[in-house]
Structures are given as C-alpha cells and as structure tokens.
Amino acid sequence: MARAPRWMLGWLLLACCVPHTEPLAVMSVDMGSESMKIAIVKPGVPMEIVLNKESRRKTPVAVALKENERLFGDSALGMSIKTPKVAFRYFQDLLGKQIDNPQVALYQSRFPEHELVKDEKRQTVIFKLSQTLQYSPEEMLGMVLNYSRGLAEEFAEQPIKDAVITVPAYFNQAERRAVLHAARMADLKVLQLINDNTAVALNYGVSGGKTSMPLHSFSFQNIMFYDMGAGSTVCTIVTYQTVKTKDSGTQPQLQIQGIGFDRTLGGLEMELRLRDYLAKLFNDQHPSKDVRKNPRAMAKLLKEANRLKTVLSANADHMAQIEGLLDDIDFKAKVSRQEFEDLCSDLFQRVPGPVQQALSSAEMNLDGIDQVILVGGATRVPKVQEVLLKAVGKEELGKNINADEAAAMGAVYQAAALSKAFKVKPFMVRDAAMFPIQVEFTREVEEDDKSKSLKHNKRILFQRMAPYPQRKVITFNRYTDDFEFYVNYGDLSFLNQDDLRIFGSLNLTTVRLKGVGESFKKHSDYESKGIKAHFNMDESGVLSLDRVESVFETLVEDKLEEESTLTKLGNTISSLFGGGGHTPEAGENLTDSVQEEEESLAEAAKEEQGVKQGQKSSAEDAGEEQGEEKQQSPHPDQAEAVPPKEESQKNEEGEKSEARDPKEDKETVNEEELSKSSGAGTAAKAEEEKKIKAPKKQKLVHEITMELDVNDVPDLLEDELKSSMKKLQDLTIRDLEKQEREKSANSLESFIFETQDKLYQEEYLFVSTEEEREEISKKLSEASNWMEEEGYAAATKELKDKLAELKKLCRNLFFRVEERRKWPERLAALESLLNHSNIFLKGARMIPESDQIFTEVELGTLEKAINETTVWKNETLAEQNKLSPAEKPVLLSKDIELKIAGLDREVQYLLDKAKFAKPKPKKEKNATKSDSGKNATGTSESENTIPPTEGKQEEKPEDISPAKEPPTTEKVVTDDEPGSDSSSKKEKKPEAGGESRKNDEL
C-alpha cells in the first residue's frame, strides 16, 4: 500500500480544538466517468486512498438494480455482462440535462438496453426498469456517493459526513447543482465541489509530483495538465508562484489561467469503436448471426475492447477472444495497434483541440509553458502521446504524477483544509469560472422626441475565467418601483455548435423584486443610493443571489468638535487621495465606498478557506467590467457591476470604491486634477470647511423581497429531495437487512458443517459419549435438511433462532473441550507462581530481625495464601481425576486464573514494599561508628549492612539491586569525614559476594 511521502506528514496536523464527539475523518471522491477513487484523512492517516472490498484502489462507477437486490462496483460490473439492462454506467453525462439534450440521445445510442423516459415536471431524464423501479441520474449518483461513504467509513473505522467531490471543469450551473442534490440524497455534507483539474494541480503543488520537494519551494512556473479520462478531455494551464499576504506572510499559490475541453473525447469512445469493430469481425465469421442485436453479447465485446485497448498500448498486436459470445459460439480474432489507430484516427485529430482552447483562454502561447504533464488513463494510449507531443512542441511529456489518483489526493487535501478537525499549511487556490455570467434588464427610457421606449441592458457579472470564490454587487440606480431582471450566461462564442447544444439553456434565473416602491414611499426623506443585488459564486462554482437591498442615506448635522492632530492628518490624506471638494457627487462616491467596504468585510468573514483574492487582479477585473459597462450603455447610471474587493487606482493602500456612472467619474476626475494643481493649499481649505461643517451620514437598508425562477433546469423541490432521500434510505436499509440475513444463513451453514466434522475428532471423542454424539448429529442433519428445503426463504430471525438452538445443544461438549485445552497452560503458570512464592517467603524470613522490613502479619498472610492455593490445587486435581472426561469438570480454567491472581497480588505487595523500603536509622548509626573505627570495624559494618540487601535480592534480585546500594552508599559518604574515600571503598567490597549470589540466583 502506497504511503504519503515523509515530508507530506508535516503538512497535515490534527487540530486540538475539536470535540472528540464529532467525526474527525473527512473524505474526497474523485468521481470519474468510468471509475472513482476515494481518499480519506483521519488522525494518524495523513492522506490515503481507500481500498474497496476487493482491495483495489479504484472502484467502477456502476450500479446494478434488481427487484430485491442492489450491487455496486465490481459486482455491478459483473452484472452488466449477465443482465445489461439492470446495470447502469456513465450516467454522470445525464446530470443537469433535459430529455431533448443531444447528450441524452448520444447516451441512448451507446447503451440501447436502457429505457429513458421524461420527467414530466422537470423535463429531465429518468431510468425506467419497471413501473415501480424508476430512478433519476441524481438518485443513481446519490447511491454511488453513499456507497463510497460506506467504503471510506469502513476503511477509516469511524463515521464520515464531510466530503469534497470532484466535477469536470466544464460543468455548468445546472450540472453542479445536480451533483449537490445527489450528495444531499446520500446525506453527505459537501465541503466543496472542486474541479478535477484544480484538484490535480493542487496535488502537484503540494507534493511536487515525484520530486523530493514540494513545488511551492520553486520559482514561478506555468504548467499545462492534459487530462484525458474515459469520458472527456480537459486541458488546463496553471500558474504556480509564491505570494506575500498580510496575515500569513509568503504562501504558495496556484491560479487557473486557461481551460480547454472536449466533452466526448476519451477512452470510452475508443472502446466503443473497438467494440463495433469486433462485432463486425464476428458477423463476418458467422454471416447467419448478428451479434449487434444481443445486448449481452455487446456488453461482453465492450469488456473485451477495454482489455484490448490496454494491451495494445504496450503491444503491436493481440488476440481478442471471448468464450460463448453468442449461442455458445466462441470468438477469436487478431487485432493490431495499427488497426486500432485507424479506427480512432478522427479522435486523435481532436487531441490538440483542448490545448489550443486553453492557450486562447489564458492568452498565452506554448513558449510560456514550462512543462506538459499527462493525467488520466486514456493518455496511456501511445498515439495520444505522439499527437500531443507534436502539438505542444516539447521534448517530452511529464509523467511525474499518479495519473489515476492525483485528483483524489488533491481533493482530500482540500477537504482537510476546509474541515474544522485539521490544520494544514495554506496553499492558496484561485480557481476560474469557465463561462461568463451577466445580468440583463429592461428599462423604459425617454427619446429625444419625448417618446418612451424600452431599452435592453446587459452588465457583465463574472467575466470568462473570472476567479472564484467571489462576491459581486449590482446597483440599480434608476428604479423606484418593482421590477425584474435576468441572470444569464454571457458570450459563449468560444464554444462550438455541438458544445452549445449540449450546454443547454443560456438563461439561468429570472429575479422579480417586490416591495421596491414601498421602500421609496416609506423612506421619502432619505436620498436613494440604489437597489443593490448581492451575488455570490461560492467555492463550488455555484452562483447564488444572497439578498437584494434598497439603500438610503441622509446627512445629519453634528455639533462642532475640536479635531485632534491625528484626525487633521487623516483628513488631509483623505483630501489628497479623494478630492478636496464636497460636491454632491463627491458625497455619493464616499457613501459608495463605505457600502463597498462593508461588503468586503462580510465577504472576508464568510470565506472559510482563507483564500484571498489579490487586490491588484481584482482591480484589473473591475476595470474591465466598468469599461464594458460604459461601452454598452448610453445611460450608465441604470446599473453598476461591482466586484467585492475593487481597488482604487489612485490608492495603493487598498481603499475600495464602487463603480460609478460616467458623469460621476468625470466629476471625480476633475476634482482630482484640481487637487493636483492646488496642492496643499486645497487640502488646507478643505480642512477649514470640515471644521465649519462636519455632516454625519446616516444609512438605512431596506430588505427587498425577491422571487426566483430557475430557467435552465428546474431544481428539485424540497419535498422531492426528501422523497428521493427516503427512497435511497429504504434501499440502504433493505441492503443491510439482506446482508444480515445472508450473514445469518452463512453462520448457520458453517456451524452445521464444522460441528459435524468436529464430532469425530479425537479431542471431541474423548470428552463425549456415543449417545451425546448421536443426538447432536441427528439435530445437525435435521437443520441441514431444513436449510436446503426451507432455509432459502427463512427470515433472519428464524435463522438466528435455529443457530442459537444448535449452539445450546453443543454448549456442554464445546465447554469440556475448551477447558481441557486451557488446563496445561494454566496449571503450569500456577505451579511456577507457587514455587517462586515459596522461595520468596523463605528468603524474607531469613532477614535478621533488626533489619526486617516485613511484619509477621504480612509474611503470615503470604504463607496462608500459598498453603490454601496448594491445598486447593491438589484437592481439585484429585477430584477431577475421579470424574469421567464426559462429565462436567470441577477444575475450571477461570478458577485457576482467580487463584493465580490472588497469590500474585500478595507477592507483589511485598515486592513493592521491599523496593521502596528505607534502611532503618539504626543502620545509619552503626555505619557512622564503623567509619570512626575504619579498618578495625570495617568488616563488622559490612556484615551489618549486607543481610538486609541479601534478603531483598532473594525477594526479587532485579528489582532490589538498584534500590539497595544507592541509599546505603549515600548515607556513608555523607557522614564520613573528608578523606574517608578509601574506607568507603573497602566497606563496599564484601558486597561483591552478594552480587555473586545474585548472579547465581538468576
């Protein structure tokens, strides 16, 4: 099993602030078209790929649905060969698609065995197996996600609720919402939908591929990732660099610069062409047969085509063979790599397409690309690599990341970063939205001839490749009554006609505002600052309208106050950067700045990742949007698109200003020019004016009711979501009950077969009678016959009751066998403990009374325990020997264990006391006297001090030795006169005998 590099362990640290009652593990699911990879992070497991029940690192995305059975993974894949109609694969292509979408027709042509019907409410697709079995693609995906969570929980050995799920970068809003619906059906909390190309880039940035150091330690780089999977191809250009932030200093960052894709270019299309070619060869060999009309035979051919494609990637030719393909006819045909490449020649011509799209969207050329790295299983096809290498003009293609697992590992790193249970080193991720989004509205305008007409206006909300997560505010200045506007996709001319047809509706949402007129009537004394619509594109790339507000403002006179020196300085700086005048336009600009700053603060509080947009890039994006607004609308005060962190071009310190109409901009520019010409004099004049009159702005926000109509693919209603959740939960409960029943049936069968075999083993024959064995054998035979005749339809409870009945019948026999197995070991342990206890007791009683550390009661208690245990052992053994082996034993292993524990407790008590006992004061006094006599009393002193330590050595030599010498030695040295070292050494010599005895005892 592969493990994360050692340096990566330092990137992932468990946070200590999370309550232990909450699940700590998080997971990621790389949901590919053909297979999925699951990864987890939990305490002690930094980042690991989950193994499925077959111990494989990737699991087929397949679901098999029968009347009373549901299979996943390899089991479902096997069912696709036996019963293709009930096995479903590649259904992710149908997410967020209505029934008339070309992608639905393509799916039907690829898999004609499935019946697709229309959902009358949403106009989407439903798989119909029967009148009672009908499932939507979201429900299918929900089943797979729930299954993946089960695998992750089993691998992590704890519950998991939080997940990061990968989606293709080209998924639009409807497709992303469909994945979120599926996750909710599976009761998964989605921390983020991360684009699979972004997950790969993050994994490469964190790990540095197969290099020894992570990429963030290197300099600025542009990397192109070419990902060809089973269903589609995506090419991504990523910029890696280190950036400085105020809060965290220097941090690594990746930014998605450009993306190109081909929805239908992948390994599956190659396999389908190879399948059709094999079918043609079979029909040529057997003209009277048509294998194309047999779904089961075509499923076998597709499986063989998958194997053949893999083998031909390493061999020039290979023999395709299938036993019993159709009507028990075997199929065998030789296929060369050249034939395979000819079949897919037009597919290989499409390989450079995503590269050119990515370069175009990034506004780069190939000279700016440092490396091209391959991702995805289909990139292993040699012809793909050959064409791609020629298209990018590099010396070689990078293969230094795991093409199958990079996305799952990058996603699980992001899951750990978003989870509250872990703390990871920050790696800033700036993803990009592929498709531009704009706001459209219609307003009545007055022409030169005083006539009125309707004018359609468009404002860009998110440019193509705009970074996200990001919040935007649109301000409508000319509306005083209820109105509606539309959120649609922007210019998609970069897509070809096929992609546009698959893309679906270009209209996202119709927003109707209620209560605008009432807010103006209610606050007629206030000055209107417009109707502000707050949009948010979250970490998953899903756009939402958070709220709509009607903003009003008025000036309130304050009493004159003496300004402090610091306030004067601040006002001077503000006047220099913001203009010195107090025209009404300047007042409006100041108000907008305050509102926008509040918005930015709200955004900062909401961002959970800590991913911050660079102020410079945000300012550039804002400038582009403002410029486009000016070009498209002759009445620019009708609406303004405002990025949340727009930086003023004049203020390098990050002051924020809201987009203004040309009139306001013009007047502001004039004020700035005046400020430059007048210099400090103008600033001083402005200070004097502020001293005379210092108005205070009072802002009032009125919430506007909004009604949303989804125009692309209608979302599931809350009741529909709950109904789907219950449907999936019922299926899960049914699966668990079925597994429990199968487990009970297997346990019963195993018990019957094992016990029938045991009855004639020697140890069972020895402890049983012929009558007992016959009775047990009869009951086992009856149970076996019952299993064959009725057991297949028996309920789980009935199976468990039958097993419990048989176990009860055999309980006494098994007990006698088990006891006799335990006797030798238990009795040997008891005998050993008795011997050691007797030796210890004898040694303790040999200690002179003057040095005795044990009381008579303590020694007597130990002696009593030894005697009682010995008597019990002898009497019980004698009584047991009188009994027949087939009778219930009186010598029980649990009783032996109790006796061992009781005796060991008494011995251990005395050993602990000896270990920590201190020499009596009498010994210290004798030692001092012996020191004064030195040579004359040296021998006598040694004799007085050695016996207690000898006693302790007999008790437990290895424990007493270190406790004996240091206290005695320290006492002698402390009491000695200076220069008595030689005497001390002489006094220690007799202890050598004690040490020798200690070694002998050991």
From Swiss-Prot:
Molecular function via GO: adenyl-nucleotide exchange factor activity; ATP binding; ATP-dependent protein folding chaperone
GO cellular component, one term: endoplasmic reticulum lumen
Family named by the database record: Belongs to the heat shock protein 70 family.
Protein name: Hypoxia up-regulated protein 1
Pfam families: HSP70
Source organism superkingdom: Eukaryota
Phylogenetic lineage: Eukaryota, Metazoa, Chordata, Craniata, Vertebrata
Motif, Prevents secretion from ER: chain positions: 999-1002
Annotated SUPFAM superfamilies: Actin-like ATPase domain, Heat shock protein 70kD (HSP70), C-terminal subdomain
PANTHER family hit by this protein: HSC70CB, ISOFORM G-RELATED, HYPOXIA UP-REGULATED PROTEIN 1
Localisation per UniProt entry: Endoplasmic reticulum lumen
Main location group: endoplasmic reticulum
Biased composition (Basic and acidic residues): 643-675, 951-962, 983-1002
Region forming the signal peptide: 1-23
Sorted UniProt keywords: ATP-binding, Chaperone, Endoplasmic reticulum, Nucleotide-binding, Signal
A biological-process GO annotation: negative regulation of hypoxia-induced intrinsic apoptotic signaling pathway
Region (Disordered): 576-698, 918-1002
Tagged with keyword ATP-binding: yes
